Design a protein with these regions (language model features):
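Active-site HxH/HxHxD metal-binding segment of metal-dependent hydrolases
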Residues: 88-165, 182
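Conserved beta-strand hairpin/beta-sheet module of binuclear metal-dependent hydrolase folds
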Residues: 37-90, 185-189, 193-197
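Short N-terminal segments immediately surrounding and downstream of signal-peptide cleavage
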Residues: 25-40
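Acidic/histidine-rich helix-loop elements
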Residues: 46-61, 134-144, 204-217
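Divalent metal-coordination and catalytic microenvironments
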Residues: 41, 66, 76, 90, ...
Length: 320
């Protein structure tokens, strides 16, 4: 898609800048919130490009806002430090009450701002696994571990989608098995034909499978398959980082993961160590095709090839 390519080009140009920013931390005061209308009453909020060293394509995670007479439903909450900016952007869309906020996964760039909205009366909704992860220290994204307001109060597990109706929209919270983390959810707006997929798909850098928080390669592949089945030919998919894609964009992404997995498995079968597998450059056929794929191993701005290969090796070596 043209929009996605333009955004990724900008992100690539900012990768060098991200190396410097990585050492300095995130300059939250420089982050501005951009609002984009996705459907008549559905909006996407995103942070400034080339400010967040971990996400040069846009600071923090993407936020969804469903607005209307029934109140506001939000998807994710960004960093705690920019909660006031996010709130101002939401209120500019609609001054009504923020009734619900659902989290796609537990990382701080998606959940650290939860307390800002919970204290205004929003009911926090998420997977039980996500709540359990957030309750364990350390807190993420600047959130205070001692502040219970940041934790979801309405939780669900793996199973059928949680479905509700609001503002003329049918919203589905679709749980997926351990993928990016152990408590991922994709959120579908049926009438708008939009799905917010969280971080098990990203269009900058290689996949990030957070095994420390329950993520798995097998689950990430399954989540991609589920998304391709649920999405229609015209469905707009909003990743946690990056611009819109559609289901056909997921195919080369999935195929790349499968190819790397199979090559790493082959080398493990030959008795290769992780360092030997890294030296084999198994991602070489994809490095120039994956935006950010040529970033060196010590660079911020997305998951590098070496980081991804280490994740794959670790999971396959463990026989998972």
């Amino acid at each position: 898609m043209k929009r996605a390519k333009q955004s990724l080009l900008a992100a690539g140009m900012g990768a060098a800048l991200s190396v410097t920013l990585l050492a300095q931390g995130i300059p939250y005061d420089k982050i501005e919130i951009k609002t984009e209308k996705v459907a008549p009453n559905l909006y996407m909020l995103s942070g400034s490009e080339n400010v967040d060293p971990g996400h040069p394509d846009g600071a923090g995670g993407r936020i969804g806002v469903l607005a209307g007479p029934d109140g506001i439903f939000m998807v994710d909450s960004q960093y705690l430090q920019i909660g006031d900016k996010v709130l101002a952007a939401v209120k500019k869309i609609d001054p009504g009450p923020i009734r619900f906020l659902a989290n796609t996964h537990l990382h701080g760039d998606h959940t650290a701002g939860n307390a800002t909205f919970a204290k205004l009366g929003a009911v926090l909704i998420a997977r039980e696994e996500l709540r359990e992860g957030m309750a364990r220290p350390p807190a993420r994204g600047g959130a205070d571990t001692r502040d219970p307001a940041r934790l979801p109060v309405l939780t669900y597990g793996m199973g059928d989608p949680v479905r509700f109706r609001m503002n003329g929209e049918i919203v589905e919270l679709i749980p997926v098995r351990a993928a990016h983390t152990g408590g991922d959810t994709m959120i579908r707006f049926v009438n708008a034909d939009v799905i917010m997929v969280g971080d098990f798909y990203r269009n900058f850098g290689y996949p990030f499978i957070d095994t420390n928080n329950g993520g798995s390669l097998k689950g990430a592949l399954e989540a991609l398959e589920v998304t391709m089945k649920v999405a229609g030919p015209n469905t707009r998919l909003i990743p946690g980082h990056g611009s819109y894609v559609n289901r056909t964009d997921l195919i080369p992404y999935r195929d790349m993961i499968l190819a790397v997995r199979d090559k790493v498995q082959e080398l493990i079968g030959q008795g290769k160590t992780v360092e030997e597998v890294l030296a084999a450059k198994v991602t070489a056929p994809f490095d120039s095709k994956v935006p950010g794929g040529l970033l060196p191993a010590n660079t911020g701005g997305g998951t590098t090839a070496d980081r991804f290969v280490r994740m794959v090796y670790s999971e396959l070596k463990a026989g998972k």
